[in-house]
């Protein structure tokens, strides 16, 4: 498999990056979920090697399902649709195309020495309307 075409040079110390898996273990167009310091992250690899990391939590429902979302595009923008209610999100920015009420949290991701690394800075909030406590990651 080819080297990813997208990575982030995020601020922070090297300890801010968490190794998730070997890059070669990811399948293009098939989302994978990872738990990083209590935060569920969805990894999405495109056939051209572009790699994205977003919250695995559906902003509309609070369910942890985005790794099973539908990968697509809107013009030149790569998208991920919720498998539940089909809200469509920009994988780069997290913007929701179908409702301004929602946004999908995105994370810096890179591949270093063949290992996928994600930078998660946890921000939590209470979401009682979703039955979710402080483990909810704000978008």
Residue ranges of predicted features:
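Short cysteine clusters
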Residues: 58, 82-85
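N-terminal pre-ligand scaffold of iron-sulfur
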Residues: 1-77, 90-91, 103-139
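Axial heme c-ligation environment in periplasmic c-type cytochrome domains
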Residues: 97-100
